[in-house]
Regions:
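Alpha-helical elements of Rossmann-like donor-binding domains used by nucleotide-donor carbohydrate transfer enzymes
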Residues: 26-30, 48, 62, 66, ...
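Short, surface-exposed acidic
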Residues: 35-46, 72-82, 205-206
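Metal-dependent phosphoesterase signature
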Residues: 50-96
Length: 206
């Protein structure tokens, strides 16, 4: 890998940048309706185990036991997991082609910095063939930390071993981008492929 310009590392988010979110409120609403579950009741039970699941301190089955299978159901956890996976699809004007172009340049270390459970993260990487384009996957399920907490950005910087100002971070959520900026990274808030390409061209990445 030959270094180029002012940056050494390009980090992408996944949900909202390349694919739909793995298990956010929109995806949850679809699956809850499919299984005829009360959304308010689910959401009241969901948040605490969800945080632990994304940090990989509990399994998907532990999460579902806490949020759904605390009483008998007419469907199985595996039925529910299959429906969860079906929600992961590419978004319009996504950044997958940008990821591939940056990786093909062989000038940068290319990776992810995302919040996702191990189950959905690894499914999404395999399903959409993203792994060959990545040098590093800094997912919440591997680091035990979540965006926008400052500690996940600091840990990412330590792992990457380069100054924060030589890292570009791309995320669709302003709060996550702002948190990266606060740790010294160059953050880009993603709104679409054309916008991202234009900004990376200005930075002489593409």
């Amino acid at each position: 890998m030959a270094k180029s310009g002012n940056f050494d590392v390009i980090l992408f988010d996944v949900g909202g940048v390349m694919l739909t979110n793995g298990w956010d409120h929109i995806e949850r609403a679809v699956v809850l309706k499919q299984f005829d579950l009360d959304r308010a009741e689910f959401e009241a039970r969901h948040e605490k185990p969800y945080d632990a699941w994304e940090r990989d301190t509990i399994s998907v089955y532990d999460y579902l036991d806490a949020a759904i299978f605390y009483q008998p159901r007419s469907f199985t956890p595996d039925d529910f997991i299959a429906a969860m996976k079906e929600q992961s699809v590419p978004i319009p004007a996504n950044a997958m082609s940008v990821l591939k172009d940056v990786a093909a340049s062989d000038k940068y270390l290319v990776g992810l910095l995302n919040n996702e459970s191990r189950l959905l993260h690894e499914y999404r990487m395999e399903k959409y063939g993203l792994k060959p384009y990545l040098d590093v996957q800094l997912s919440s399920c591997y680091l035990g930390m979540r965006k926008p907490d400052a500690e996940i950005y600091r840990r990412a910087i330590d792992i990457l071993g380069v100054p924060a100002n030589r890292i570009i971070f791309i995320d669709d959520r302003k709060g996550n981008a702002d948190a990266a900026t606060a740790q010294g990274m160059h953050a880009i808030q993603f709104t679409g492929e054309d916008q991202l390409r234009a900004q990376l061209k200005e930075l002489e990445i593409l």
